[in-house]
Amino acid sequence: MTGEPAFAAAPAGGLPRRSAQAPASAGGCKTTTSCGTSAPVQDPEIAEKIANHPCYTAEAHQYYARMHVAVAPGCNIQCNFCNRKFDCANESRPGVTSTLLTPEDALAKVNVVASEIKQMSVLGIAGPGDPLANPKPTFRTIELVARDCPDIKLCLSTNGLRLPEFVDRIADLNVDHVTITINMIDPEVGERIYPWVAWRGKRYTGREASKILSEQQLAGLAALTERKILCKVNSVMIPGINDEHLVEVSRTVKGLGAFLHNVMPLVSAPEHGTVFGLTGQRGPTPQELKALQDRCEQDDGAEMNMMRHCRQCRADAVGLLGEDRGDDFLPETFQGREIVYDLAGRQQAHEEIERWRTEVAATRQTLNIATGARTPDVPAAEPVRPAEVVLVAVATKGSGVVNQHFGHAGEFWIYEAGPGWARLVQTRDVDRYCNGPSDCDEDASKLDRTIEMLSDCAAVLCSKIGLGPREALEEAGIEPVEIYDLIDKAVAEIGARLVTDRAPAEVGTP
């Protein structure tokens, strides 16, 4: 295999070349597989839509970037987990932004970002309020970007209250990805999440408010899927309030045609100023979140595509998932500038990405490694999950490679690992242990928190690790592994060894 593509930061030199070539049809996501979700995509049109969408495809998020533009300030509902504060540059939560944009400024920003981050494939309008509560700037932004940036996928996120009203408009503008936040289908649950909704000139509270919201959300979802618009449903997991109920939510939205369900953890802290933050409502542990995602995925034996790699992005996020480059694109970088949209350069960059993805997929096929998705050569077959697996954490900057120093990681990707098995099941945020070569040991609590976050993992894979963290991980019973290789290959190989070497009582089904 050749080295990583030029768009990815990587050590000099490439990976070992594979011993045998696999068919090129295995490459990238332009197959009939779901490319990282647990169910197949038999429709070639859908497969093409999600091929380079970093939110809808787990594999694509290693290669393609997204950006959000904050053009929608107002909201028509109040959530107990939300506080739309402006100028919160140090926060990474949905609904926060540093700057509100006009549609014209949004277009200018998209042009600048698309020229510099050529792997940016998706534009989303996700706040800081609700896009459909601000239809004029939302749809004007979509019109401008569609006119000038024809290769960028258009998405919007909504609470769904006004969704049925705008389904035809969304379809007419060729927006083919819509995310709806649905946290309940039972108003009794909803009244504990939503203090009020503003509907047709009146403010409603209590169960009546939640009933109106739920009816509109489900009607909007059904109408979108009838028009073959791909829908992702976001749900915030709130322990003790809707955690058990979300299994029913998942079952319902699947029945209405939702393509993907994203169960996210509640982000709750007093400094956020939310009702839940101020009242001490806790969020779920990573283990609780994974258990609920697993239940939703396999409810009643019917598989639901679950998003496992969400980063709960800001309303002005820019870059790869897990990477926020918003500070590189402040208003002074795009306001008043005339940028020629580099369509040819972007197409060349995307072709390079796809060549690399083809090599990665071919190597995976040659080594007979399953990732939890059905394979293109046997589309009807279930992936064979080993009876015994362990969890393995990976430090990566993307491109499908273990290529990050342990101390530089702001997040770890969590994989199920076993013989011939490497399945991404979660990402976990941590505080970077190192901010440079000279300040890796000043705050031992950062390392302690990272180790606690990875306490259920059998190993950590990274490109480099210092002696101190290595010893601390070993003391905690976590094996540190220095390696530079394909993630799937490294995870499957390490998993096979760990499953073989560990006592039966230590190996389970995470």
Curated annotation (Swiss-Prot):
Enzyme nomenclature, EC number: 4.-.-.-
Positions of the UniProt region annotated as Disordered: 1-34
Presence of keyword Phosphoprotein: no
Enzyme class at the top of the EC tree: lyase
Annotated residues for binding of [4Fe-4S] cluster 2: C310, C313
Positions contributing to [4Fe-4S] cluster 1 binding: C75, C79, C82
Residues involved in S-adenosyl-L-methionine binding: G129, T181
Biased composition (Low complexity): 1-16, 25-34
Keyword terms: 4Fe-4S, Iron, Iron-sulfur, Lyase, Metal-binding, Nitrogen fixation, S-adenosyl-L-methionine
GO MF annotation, one: 4 iron, 4 sulfur cluster binding
Domain of life: Bacteria
GO terms for biological process, alphabetical: nitrogen fixation
PANTHER family to which the protein is assigned, alphabetical: FEMO COFACTOR BIOSYNTHESIS PROTEIN NIFB, FEMO COFACTOR BIOSYNTHESIS PROTEIN NIFB-RELATED
Protein name: FeMo cofactor biosynthesis protein NifB
Organism of derivation: Frankia alni
Phylogenetic placement of the source organism: Bacteria, Bacillati, Actinomycetota, Actinomycetes, Frankiales
Gene (name only): nifB
